[in-house]
Curated annotation (Swiss-Prot):
Pfam families: Rnf-Nqr. One of its GO terms (cellular component) is plasma membrane. It is an enzyme of class 7 (translocase). Signal peptide: none annotated. It is found in: Cell inner membrane. The lineage of its organism: Bacteria, Pseudomonadati, Pseudomonadota, Gammaproteobacteria, Cellvibrionales. Composed of six subunits; NqrA, NqrB, NqrC, NqrD, NqrE and NqrF. Keywords: Cell inner membrane, Cell membrane, Ion transport, Membrane, NAD, Sodium, Sodium transport, Translocase, Transmembrane, Transmembrane helix, Transport, Ubiquinone. NQR complex catalyzes the reduction of ubiquinone-1 to ubiquinol by two successive reactions, coupled with the transport of Na(+) ions from the cytoplasm to the periplasm. NqrA to NqrE are probably involved in the second step, the conversion of ubisemiquinone to ubiquinol. Belongs to the NqrDE/RnfAE family. It comes from Teredinibacter turnerae (strain ATCC 39867 / T7901). This is Na(+)-translocating NADH-quinone reductase subunit E. Its main location: membrane.
């Protein structure tokens, strides 16, 4: 249990998808103008990560890994080369389901996210979660915790950035840095702040 808690804390703070690996920057910068939209997208990313990483773990463990098909009498088959397209298919299917759900039950959030909701399908933070899971050889329980933690870490980062950007509307930003210029600087400073967690040994 302690290992799972440590993994969750590490994936949220020490190995933050947005501020440590700079994954998912497209939507991270585009949807961080308002806190409400950022929270909505953050929750969507948490849900997608929490489901796709464990599902992809099961697919890799029982179908794609070298020797995974031994249960089917095919111990020498290695389908790991199908990993990327399989993970993308799982992510795309889940995002499509979520898009239909939000369109039906939460239209305000659906309209606020706009084109960036289907773009979660190609959000490299989502794909990164599954690839890190395979690379680090997580088991199913670790995959659930890592998926939830990495999604929560990304949501925390985009919500914090949105809050800062809302406050910056009332700041006297130099003309040449207005818009994405000052946003990149803020993201860099946030990343430096999160680097302080790197000294924590878990």
């Amino acid at each position: 249990m302690a290992d799972l808690i440590a993994l969750f804390v590490r994936s949220v703070f020490i190995e933050n998808m947005a501020l440590a690996f700079f994954l998912g920057m497209c939507t991270f910068l585009a949807v961080s103008k308002k806190v409400d939209a950022a929270i909505g997208l953050g929750v969507a990313v948490v849900v997608v990560q929490t489901v796709t990483v464990p599902v992809n773990n099961l697919l890799y463990t029982y179908f794609l890994a070298d020797g995974a098909l031994a249960w089917a009498g095919l111990p020498n088959v290695d389908l790991s080369f199908l990993g990327l397209i399989t993970y993308i298919g799982v992510i795309a299917a889940l995002v499509q389901i979520m898009e239909m759900f939000l369109d039906r039950y939460v239209p305000a959030l659906y309209n606020a996210l706009g084109v960036f909701l289907p773009l979660i399908t190609v959000n490299c933070a989502i794909m990164g979660g599954s690839l890190f899971m395979v690379e680090r050889d997580y088991n199913f329980a670790e995959s659930v915790v890592f998926g939830t933690g990495s999604g929560f870490g990304w949501a925390l980062a985009i919500t914090a950035l949105a809050g800062i950007r809302e406050k910056m509307k009332y700041s006297d930003v130099p003309e040449g840095l207005q818009g994405l210029g000052i946003t990149f600087i803020v993201v860099g400073l946030m990343s430096l702040g999160f680097m302080s967690f790197g000294g924590i040994s878990l």
